[in-house]
């Protein structure tokens, strides 16, 4: 099938954009949006919310990028659906670039593990392909701990079936934080070094078993409140219908988290932060943009942020059109956020509120300090995460996200793109 007329000129430019077409048609799955409250969102550190999704599709050849549906949690949380076992038992999971393990609640969970009883649970007896492992694991997240045992079974994701993965059956989730989560578990997309018990991350397994062409994935997070869907996660490449080229590639400096070097941050014409350069992590598991306390305090002073409890800042909604842009210098290119990008508008008890998309987070040396570019940034810019291979190092590609329906007809057939 030939590409749409509007896409043909773009494909001619691919050699200049440092990408290459695969000739494969991209697979899409419809997504849905829901809107719970933000206080829970803060507790969850940006984990994603589930939705009713269609059954997972038929198997796809390894040379096709695979789309996994994401659903939006109050504009800054996204999640999708996977299947485990034979036949597949479906779970909603947060796709997290800041961790590397896959886990879901277990039917064998502890009686007093409240979060377990409020979510879908994996039943090993209901799967004909289940293989016991039994190794104990424990994962500590920013907002809670998960304990359980490792097991092995078949993974279904975005149409791919048959991947044999080792995953965690969560037996004990002592933190009530996960009780508030509208997702069941977490699928980590970080580097192997972050993986607990040396388990191969799901992305690595898909590549090693020939079900995925390259260890590359990209996120398009749709933050348009008028749209019912939350965007798409593309496994194996990226889709030019999601972004305005070119992609700017920035090398990963610490291959654990998706950490890169950020040259500067500017707030309007007058304030410069990260003046001597600093570390930044792109993290789909973080809702907001975080940075060192002193710099975030200065940023809020420049945009008129009024401090509230729990580190939140409120913005006067009437001032949004007058607020300065906040710009991030990455790979020699400025990535600008307007106030409409970084102010989160919500309604509480019938009252319209405007909340800042920036929050302070101090991480001491040697790991920190660093900024985290979470979903407020990733909702404006598509990110292509390229793990690299023996010939190339890991890197992240960034480009402005297209407005749904603009520039390319949304839903038209497009050609996949892979970082070169």
UniProtKB/Swiss-Prot annotation:
Residues 78-399 form the Peptidase A1 domain. It comes from the Eukaryota. Residues 1-25 form the signal peptide. Keywords: Aspartyl protease, Disulfide bond, Glycoprotein, Hydrolase, Protease, Secreted, Signal, Zymogen. Disulfide bonds join 109-116, 274-278, 317-354. Its EC number is 3.4.23.-. Pfam families: Asp (PF00026). Coiled coil: none annotated. One of its GO terms (molecular function) is endopeptidase activity. Its main location: secreted. One of its GO terms (cellular component) is lysosome. Glycans are attached at residues 90, 133, 336. Residues 26-63 form a propeptide. It is an enzyme of class 3 (hydrolase). InterPro entries: Aspartic_peptidase_A1, Aspartic_peptidase_AS, PEPTIDASE_A1, Peptidase_aspartic_dom_sf. It is found in: Secreted. The active site is at 96, 283. Expressed predominantly in adult lung (type II pneumocytes) and kidney and in fetal lung. Low levels in adult spleen and very low levels in peripheral blood leukocytes. This is Napsin-A. It comes from Homo sapiens (Human). The lineage of its organism: Eukaryota, Metazoa, Chordata, Craniata, Vertebrata.
């Amino acid at each position: 099938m030939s590409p749409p007329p509007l896409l043909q000129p773009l494909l001619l430019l691919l050699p200049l954009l440092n990408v290459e077409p695969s000739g494969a048609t991209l697979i899409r799955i419809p997504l849905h949006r829901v809107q719970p409250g933000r206080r829970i969102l803060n507790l969850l550190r940006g984990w994603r919310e589930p939705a009713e999704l269609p059954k997972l599709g038929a198997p796809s050849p390894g040379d096709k990028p695979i789309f996994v549906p994401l659903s939006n949690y109050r504009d800054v949380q996204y999640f999708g659906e996977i299947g485990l076992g034979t036949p597949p038992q479906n779970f909603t999971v947060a796709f997290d670039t800041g961790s590397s393990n896959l886990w879901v609640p277990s039917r064998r969970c502890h009686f007093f593990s409240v979060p377990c009883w409020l979510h879908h649970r994996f039943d090993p007896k209901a799967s004909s392909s289940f293989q016991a492992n039994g190794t104990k694991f424990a994962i500590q997240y920013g907002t809670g701990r998960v304990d359980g045992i490792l097991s092995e079974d078949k993974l279904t994701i975005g149409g791919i079936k048959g991947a044999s993965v080792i995953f965690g059956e969560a037996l004990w989730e002592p933190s009530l934080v996960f009780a508030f989560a509208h997702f069941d578990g977490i699928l980590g997309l970080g580097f192997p070094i972050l993986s607990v018990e040396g388990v191969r991350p799901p992305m690595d397994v898909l590549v090693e078993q020939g079900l995925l062409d390259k260890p590359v994935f990209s996120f398009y997070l749709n933050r348009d409140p008028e749209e019912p869907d939350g965007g798409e996660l593309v496994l194996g490449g990226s889709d030019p219908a999601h972004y305005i080229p070119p992609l700017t590639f920035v090398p990963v400096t610490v291959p654990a988290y998706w950490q890169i070097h950020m040259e500067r941050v500017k707030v309007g014409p007058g304030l410069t932060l990260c003046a001597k350069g600093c570390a930044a992590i792109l993290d789909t598991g973080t809702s907001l943009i975080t940075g060192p306390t002193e710099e975030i305090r200065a940023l809020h002073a420049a945009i008129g942020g009024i401090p509230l409890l729990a580190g939140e800042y409120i913005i006067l909604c009437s001032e949004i059109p007058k607020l300065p842009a906040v710009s991030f210098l990455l790979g020699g290119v400025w990535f600008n956020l307007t106030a409409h990008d970084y102010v989160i508008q919500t309604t509480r008890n019938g009252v319209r509120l405007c909340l800042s998309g920036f929050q302070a987070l101090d991480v001491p040396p040697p790991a920190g300090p660093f900024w985290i570019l979470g979903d407020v940034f990733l909702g404006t810019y598509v990110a292509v995460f390229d793990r690299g291979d023996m010939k190339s190092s890991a890197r992240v590609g960034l480009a402005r996200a297209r407005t749904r329906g603009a520039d390319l007809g949304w839903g038209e057939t497009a050609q996949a793109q892979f970082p070169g």
